[in-house]
Amino acid sequence: MRYLLIVFLLTSCSADFEYPATKKERTNYNLHGTTVMDPYFYMEDFESPYAVQWSDQQNALIKNYLQDSEITNIQSILTEAYSSEYYSLSFFNPDSDYYFYNSGAEQHHLYMKKGEDAAVILDPNTWAEDQTLNLDKVSISPNKKYLAYSISNGGVDWRTIKLMDLETNQNLGLEITEVKFSDITWKADSSGFYFNKYPKPLPENRLSQQSYDAAIYFADIETGEEKLFYGEINPEQNYTVSFIGDDKDILINVITGSEDENFYLYGNSPQVLEPITPINQANFSYVHADNEGLFFITNFEADNYRLVKILFADYQLIEIIPEKDFALKGVSFVNDYAIADYINHSDMRSAIVFFNTSGEELDISLPDTLSGTISGFQSAGENTILFSLNTYTQPTQYYSYDVTEASLDLIWEEIIPGFNPKDYVEVSTNYKSKDGTMVPITYSYKSSTDINKDTPIFLYAYGGYNISIRPSFTPKYAAWLELGGVLAVANIRGGGEFGKAWHNAGKLSTKQNVFDDFLYASKFLEENSIGNRKSTAISGRSNGGLLVGTTLVQNPNYFGAALPAVGVMDMIRFTEFTEGWGWRGDYGSPILNQADFQRNIKISPYHQTKIDVCYSPTLTTTGRRDDRVVPSHSYKFTARLQEYQGCTNPVMLYDATRAGHGSGNGVAMPKWKRIELFSIEQSFALKNIKQ
């Protein structure tokens, strides 16, 4: 890379506001024979004083811009929507001693103990004045004497693990750092636990340094010593560990980045582990063990996934539940049942099928009145199971089902203040994309809303990494629906809704399909007088942020507003930060591979923004401590879009301080920050689509 040290200040103006001055450098690099101009390359040092000051100025701009908008009203509705009481399902399970609880007033859930000695075990609300120290994982030792738990600081992916004595409720002084993407797995004798650890990054690059060389460590709780348990020479591998038969045998899941393929190692010590699944040929997910072998959900020779068993005796793979027409998303072993969750193609909701553990389909079914995303199956006695259900407009419900009596009881329901599920409608259908492929879409609205060509539309999609978007309730959309808007969710290609083939149709050389699918979702709604393109705000996060950014620049001034969040906006240099190298399964390796470079440069939002083109009103959001998709992606894209914007449509940035990659859960940001972020997004959208 070379730098021509010519620096000047760029200021963009409109009739109503003035963008902060932004430094521009003549920076370029040559890649595969192509000169790539990168005038905002310096923003990759996103913790520099200049970048922080620039971000603060952008935050001030968006807040000033929204002073005369719906933001106060939206904040009020969302504050009420986020004030519901919450219990985790374990509260209703007689075999569980601990649960999560929130009265509605707390920023984070409390971790509680049930019974006569009921008590608050962990209260993350007391850990930091701004509520940005957050509880992540909890794991209780087999002897129930100890609790190991992990903490996130300001939304980053890095975790610190601490240890508590459950008899005294006192911390024991153990503190393990440099933990990331890790479970906490106890040894059967409760002498310690296993976790994933990375080499310590340089302090100045902690949020951006590439993460390699993960290894499994054992924490001895008596000595406090951290001992290396397993680590291979491949720097790109990550692991999860399970123990079979009271620690007699070890099962290690070997994962390379976010590749869909993985493999498992098995043996009785780290020195004699051997692969028991095909190496990086398919996806395997361990779900259960019995005396004969290990059960896995896999797409090995089954695009829609199936349940298989690998025998201990000879590692032979036998089929338990064969592949069906619907994609298999999960299997829960509860009592004597293997309960399979399939995606119903008509509405993306759960189609639940009961099998015995030998794979025989049973004459058992949940009542037809239940419709939604069903999950969390637990045993509550020999014949009783517990589970949860929700949809886009139905907050969480917990049910108890007596299998022998076919008796269903609603045992708890989340009540969202000011929100009555009976007042809302969900419609699921399909639309034709550019190449004729039929794509599912679900749109929701308040029954009293007059749906017409001017109705505000919030159109969301993801489209990547085999992730299936299924109906689930989140309070963030309560204000949008309450104010007369429509929430539309498109299940575009790149996800896992229709199995492996659907994923393959939206990655690498087929990635353009996801942008076409998203655009044609908007066209479908407009053609059916469900809003119009100018009353539509398009939204997506992470890979979905890329989706919004690319759809935006490929279709200038088409939408009413665009809301790319924590998106991968530089599709050339994403591999150079934290876990970016692990996204090659969907994005390729543009720095190393010429074909990947030539493809990605055409769909990269940062590189495809053109001078003097009028783009739709755009609010890009990120987290200043996002160490997964680093904020420089959003900074660079915003700077270039502000520079090149060819009309007075606003181009703005909101950078949530002390926040990381996620927004829908408390691990990434506390409740008050979520309300602030969602209020800004929706206020920006409404202000622009109403003009």
Where do the language-model regions lie?
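C-terminal motif of bacterial Sec signal peptides marking the signal peptidase cleavage site
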Residues: T11-S12
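A conserved hydrophobic secondary-structure block that centers on an alpha-helix together
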Residues: V120-I184, S190
